[in-house]
């Protein structure tokens, strides 16, 4: 008998993305949505697909997702972001895993992810296969608190699926800047836990090296203008992350409140 599966989704102001996300996951046995008091129509859209909607203040990606996992009632859990989609082919592969229902096999599965920037699947720049651990047995582990890219920490054997998860990340430059600002703040706060200063070379050489790493070493030049723009953003991300780290430490040393997320 196939085992059951819960889909865990964390949202905040995702009315543009969440319907397509939910459509791709509605075949699962239940959908758990954790919303951080969205100001748009996100919750209204989610109610069309599931009654299992929980609202709580934003406490970081890891804590929000762990909260969703804790409320899942099925044998397996699949973590899905609002800008991601499960294709029919991926659904079939997931259902095959559930149908096997083995107790001594993998307890978690990595799957490749196709990242779409500005409407195009980017195959280079380290964007593919971009393996993500998203499918796991309930109770085998939890996400850590390393923001903004939390890791799932678990005990047991891991397997790999072949079919990719589709990730429609930055659709426009404006989208990229919006996420960029939030993620650089989270990255600076995470770095501040173990580092007490940012040096001048962090703001000069590191961004330059990052650009060449993405554009040349990771062959961003083969992705045309898409690759150039992504490489520039990667360089800017490095600069802003360390600039915010400097600003955060400066504020702490001066007894000021930390910058808001």
PLM feature segments, named:
Residues 9-27:
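Short, well-formed alpha-helical segments that are part of the catalytic scaffolds
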Residues 63-70, 76, 80, 87-252, ...:
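Catalytic-site signature of metal-activated, phosphate-bearing donor transferases
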Residues 19, 40-49, 89-90:
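Acidic helix N-cap motif at the loop->helix transition within catalytic regions
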Residues 4-6:
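Cell-envelope/extracellular polymer assembly enzymes that use nucleotide-activated donors
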Residues 24, 35-44, 81:
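A conserved acidic beta->alpha catalytic loop
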Residues 43-71, 100:
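Conserved donor nucleotide-binding strand/loop of the catalytic core
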């Amino acid at each position: 008998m196939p085992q059951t599966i819960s889909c865990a989704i964390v949202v905040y102001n995702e009315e543009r993305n969440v319907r397509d996300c939910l459509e791709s996951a509605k075949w699962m046995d239940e959908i758990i949505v954790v919303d951080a008091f969205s100001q748009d129509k996100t919750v209204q859209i989610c109610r069309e697909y599931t009654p299992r909607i929980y609202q709580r203040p934003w406490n970081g990606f890891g804590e929000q997702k762990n909260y969703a996992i804790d409320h899942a009632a099925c044998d397996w859990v699949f973590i899905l972001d609002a800008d991601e989609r499960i294709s029919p082919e991926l659904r079939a592969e997931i259902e095959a895993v559930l149908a096997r229902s083995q107790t001594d096999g993998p307890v978690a599965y990595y799957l490749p992810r196709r990242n779409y920037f500005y409407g195009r699947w980017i195959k280079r720049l380290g964007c593919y296969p971009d393996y993500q651990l998203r499918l796991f047995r309930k109770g085998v582990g939890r996400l850590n608190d390393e923001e903004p890219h939390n890791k799932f920490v678990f005990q047991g054997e891991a397997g790999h699926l072949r079919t990719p998860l589709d990730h429609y990340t930055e659709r426009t430059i404006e989208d990229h800047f919006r996420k960029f600002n939030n993620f650089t703040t989270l990255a600076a706060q995470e770095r501040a836990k173990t580092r007490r200063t940012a040096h001048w070379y962090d703001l000069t050489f590191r961004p330059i090296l990052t650009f060449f790493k993405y554009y040349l070493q990771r062959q961003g030049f083969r992705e045309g203008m898409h690759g150039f723009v992504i490489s520039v953003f990667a360089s800017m991300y490095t600069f802003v992350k360390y600039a915010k780290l400097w600003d955060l430490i400066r504020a702490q040393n001066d007894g000021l409140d930390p910058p808001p997320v």
